[in-house]
């Protein structure tokens, strides 16, 4: 690591300045909102002014003690602090150029992704078991802590595990590869195991509070849909499942917008049983339907290759062309295949 590079151990509250954007909800006290109301908002998951500005009025009214008149006042003051009107394409382009990408550990994979996992958006990884989804997540949990000039995000990682597949020993191996201190890398990963769909949603509220306090560059959910498949069964609960899933995805989108973090979600696949199956080479589709498809900015399809090799295909992206890349899973995480 270069002498000017930031040590992951030093990533913390001191680095969470105005440069990183989100304003704490307490900022509203300067504009006539009482400290008790700000505290109630924070307890309900609204830890930043941005989170309030992005929230519909009917949601604010659910906060205990917030009347309609008070909600109007809070939203009006939040709108003054957070620009949400029209801007020129030139200004938007300049903001887009400030976004960074987090390296995957594979040059082949980074090449088709334009540098790695984009911050400020949601990237979905879907595929069968043993296609490298969780291994890629483990590698990203370390590379997000690297300095920007090494392909990192200079921030911590928040990891929500729904399948009990998180293994710290994998992080230590990846850390050694990149010359990072293993203990410090583990300290910079905030881990939580989700046990049901409601708990998964509650963890997202806790994530918002943590991101308001310290600098995070990556949020991982591995996997997005496994608990929904067990908590909601049959067609009778399909509508309730999709509504709950949509609420969770909206929370992910809000965190990506507020804090500029890269959000990476993994997804399982299910076999297609319609008439089109006979004409399709790969008769499997990701779970979650259109709700997940529309929420994900970039969708990556992973499949097995020869030996430890895996193939990633860009299935959907607003700015990247469809392309394939071959990568491998090694003891030190995601790597390029060795010929």
Swiss-Prot record:
GO terms for biological process: chromosome organization involved in meiotic cell cycle; DNA recombinase assembly; DNA strand invasion; double-strand break repair involved in meiotic recombination; G2/M transition of mitotic cell cycle; heteroduplex formation; mating type switching; meiotic joint molecule formation. Pfam families: HHH_5, Rad51. InterPro entries: AAA+_ATPase, DNA_recomb/repair_Rad51, DNA_recomb/repair_Rad51_C, DNA_recomb/repair_RecA-like, DNA_repair_Rad51/TF_NusA_a-hlx, P-loop_NTPase, RecA_ATP-bd, RecA_monomer-monomer_interface. Keywords: ATP-binding, DNA damage, DNA recombination, DNA repair, Nucleotide-binding, Nucleus. GO terms for molecular function: ATP binding; ATP hydrolysis activity; ATP-dependent activity, acting on DNA; ATP-dependent DNA damage sensor activity; DNA strand exchange activity; double-stranded DNA binding; identical protein binding; single-stranded DNA binding. Gene3D superfamilies: 5' to 3' exonuclease, C-terminal subdomain, P-loop containing nucleotide triphosphate hydrolases. Transmembrane segments: none annotated. Required both for recombination and for the repair of DNA damage caused by X-rays. Belongs to the RecA family. RAD51 subfamily. This is DNA repair protein RAD51.
